[in-house]
Amino acid sequence: MLSVMVSSSLVLIVFFLGASEEAKPATTTIKNTKPQCRPEDYATRLQDLRVTFHRVKPTLQREDDYSVWLDGTVVKGCWGCSVMDWLLRRYLEIVFPAGDHVYPGLKTELHSMRSTLESIYKDMRQCPLLGCGDKSVISRLSQEAERKSDNGTRKGLSELDTLFSRLEEYLHSRK
């Protein structure tokens, strides 16, 4: 039963995160600072993400006619680490860059959220918080997601608040 729930959640993620591969990959500027490795150290940046998202949420969700698919089971269980790593990379490399084309009037807000999320992701990668094992499942999900269109971008951006909640849950589960 658990494997069916996890499998169903992963398949749903693949659908809504699919976006155009024409988007440029994310670039991250690496600073010579030591990352914060405690989940509570991410609270301020997550709050900043939520505040920015709240300003643009009506626009992003206006065209989203799908139900919420990024449920809490996604980051729990044996694949949670790999799923969170894949989700964050997907948002930074594909969803946010494609969002610039889908929502040109929201470029400032999207760039702000992307920059903050990049900072969180970079710190997490330098900490043991995302030390994952086998990525073969995520690799298959990624290949499937690449076949989607702008609907994946719209869905991904409209559910940013859910992503932020799942990220927070994940960070707290790694204490």
Swiss-Prot record:
What is the taxonomic lineage of the source species?
Answer: Viruses, Duplodnaviria, Heunggongvirae, Peploviricota, Herviviricetes
Origin species, per record, is Human cytomegalovirus (strain AD169)
Report disulfide bridges, numbered on this chain.
Answer: C37-C127, C81-C132
Binding partners and assembly: Homodimer; disulfide-linked.
Q: Which UniProt keywords apply?
A: Cytokine, Disulfide bond, Evasion of host immunity by viral interleukin-like protein, Glycoprotein, Host-virus interaction, Inhibition of host innate immune response by virus, Inhibition of host interferon signaling pathway by virus, Interferon antiviral system evasion, Modulation of host dendritic cell activity by virus, Secreted, Signal, Viral immunoevasion
Organism superkingdom: Viruses
GO CC terms on record? extracellular space
Q: Which InterPro entries match?
A: 4_helix_cytokine-like_core (IPR009079), IL-10/19/20/24/26 (IPR020443), IL-10_add_hlx (IPR012352), IL-10_CS (IPR020423)
Q: Predominant location of this chain?
A: secreted
List GO molecular-function terms, semicolon-separated. Answer: cytokine activity
One of the protein's GO biological processes: symbiont-mediated suppression of host type I interferon-mediated signaling pathway
Which gene codes for it? Answer: UL111A
Q: Protein name, please?
A: Viral interleukin-10 homolog
Indicate the family of this protein: Belongs to the IL-10 family.
Q: Give the signal peptide range.
A: 1-19
Which residues are glycosylated according to the annotation?
A: N151
State the function annotated in the UniProt record: Functional viral IL-10 homolog. Can bind to the human IL-10 receptor and compete with human IL-10 for binding sites. Requires both subunits of the human IL-10 receptor complex to induce signal transduction events and biological activities. IL-10 signaling pathway has several immunosuppressive activities that are exploited by the virus. Inhibits TLR-induced type I interferon production in host plasmacytoid dendritic cells.
List the subcellular locations. Answer: Secreted
